[in-house]
Amino acid sequence: MQRFFRENRTRIISALVIFVLLIVCFANAGDGEIEEAITDSKRYKSTTEWMQEIDDDTSISAISIPGTHDSAAVHIFPGFALKTQSMSIADQLTNGFRYLDIRLAVESDKDGDYLGFVHSVGKCRVKGSIFSSQMRLDGVLDQIYAFLKAHPSETVLFCVKDENSKDDSREFEQLLFKSINQNRNSWYLYDSIPKLSSVRGKIVLLRRFNDSLNYGNVGLDFTWKDQGSKESVDLPYVMSSLNGTDKLWVQDRYRYTVGQKKDVFLDMLRNVAPDDNTFTLNFLSTAGDGSIGNPKGNAEILNDILLTTDLASQTAYGTIVVDFGTRQIAQHIYMSNFANADE
């Protein structure tokens, strides 16, 4: 035995080092939440029911809505590059977020195929252990249904992307609607921007996948052009048609530096106004321009910029999407829908 260890000492030490690094990297995917300041709750609408006081006749596009990017990437390896949130999806809803960025892929186990949560090459897991099971679509939907049942004044925007380009698009759509059809009355699946009255207590499907099965009612078409270039451009956001009438403006420069991202984010806040027929998505999230992404380090800077940016009262800024969302960030965004207490 001693001879074996002597002869293989280098290999054994290397294997142990790699194993420890794997454990450390994955453990980092579940801790280190960005601290949020204590806020005066009397100044804010309830995080669980802030939509309650918005008029029924308001289009969901004409509301300032807090959202999270890669919403399920809480427990994921490697955490440094792929972790984008510190709160579970259930906690995000409780803390005021209403737009969820859902990345799914077709997965398999002994019981068959299912849709599991992923971020790029990483699988989003239920708990902060490398041995924890992968998050599944049905489990997260149950959490959302429970939230909406408890808070029927609210709606959840559910933006679904098939993250794996190798997936069979027909199977992906079939699995997705197998889950949706189990509780179809809780969904808004049409291709027109709805009024809030039509979607209270429901999930609004936003589609970033092909309707390969020609189901027809498969939600609003949110298949915007990829914005992964690192180069600065004169027009940093892109417009597409939702249904021939309504428009979608998106700023998602996810490979920009923090400085570039700050500029394009604020530029869109100033220059692209959402309204009844114009939906806007303004991503504050970025992996950065390095070979390895650093979402958390970038979010610590960019989220502070958002919190120190004055948002006018009774003004719609559309949907603002962040990494490492906190209650304070959600409140800062959604309170722009209302008059200031001092006004």
Functional labels for PLM-detected ranges:
Residues 129-183:
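Catalytic cores of phosphodiester-bond-cleaving enzymes
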Residues 61-63, 100-102, 156-158, 205-207, ...:
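Hydrophobic faces of well-ordered beta-strands that scaffold small-molecule active sites
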